[in-house]
């Protein structure tokens, strides 16, 4: 305790990638950009005659990346001890991409829609059919099954199906290999 591991990880995350403001803990808004942080560290490396580190830091800036910071204790589902870390990482990754991380099978449904180019249209269609935005309805997906199926059929051009969300729940699995 108190050795600075968390502090080191936060510093590295700001060096290795942009940290989106919405992913920073509330009250801890970054006051410097990634570029400013890296240049500060480069100056410190150069003042210690460590040109190799300064060069590596400069090179890091040329690699577009996003860092995702989160408190694993807040995101982990303690009821699933065997896969607690995996599901915490999947949840945070889904949330960072705008999907519903609180419910992994709803997030999988959203990912599938997005990967096939239907997600934005689906959200609009769902709102028209259900009378509420998808961002609100997805947390109650089981209650909106008919509207989800109708919106899905409208945007994909496929016949209307029953219980899409239930099928996602029944078939959802996640392994470390799937996530990687």
Task: Kindly give the residue locations of the regions a language model identified.
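P-loop NTPase motor core
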Residues: 2, 7-141
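Conserved helicase/translocase P-loop NTPase motor core
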Residues: 145-180
């Amino acid at each position: 305790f108190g050795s600075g591991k968390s502090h080191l990880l936060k510093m590295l995350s700001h060096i290795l990638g942009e940290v989106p403001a919405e992913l920073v803990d509330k009250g801890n808004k970054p006051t410097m950009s990634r570029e400013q942080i890296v240049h500060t560290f480069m100056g410190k490396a150069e003042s210690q005659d460590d040109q190799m580190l300064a060069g590596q830091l400069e090179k890091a800036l040329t690699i577009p990346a996003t860092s995702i910071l989160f408190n694993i204790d807040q995101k982990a589902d303690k009821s699933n001890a065997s896969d607690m870390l995996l599901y915490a990482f999947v949840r945070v990754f889904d949330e960072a991409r705008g999907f519903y991380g609180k419910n992994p099978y709803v997030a999988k449904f959203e990912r599938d829609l997005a990967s096939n180019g239907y997600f934005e249209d689906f959200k609009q269609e769902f709102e028209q059919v259900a009378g509420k935005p998808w961002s609100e309805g997805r947390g109650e997906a089981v209650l909106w099954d008919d509207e989800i199926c109708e919106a899905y059929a409208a945007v994909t051009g496929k016949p209307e199906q029953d219980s899409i969300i239930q099928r996602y729940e029944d078939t959802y699995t996640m392994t470390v290999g799937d996530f990687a």
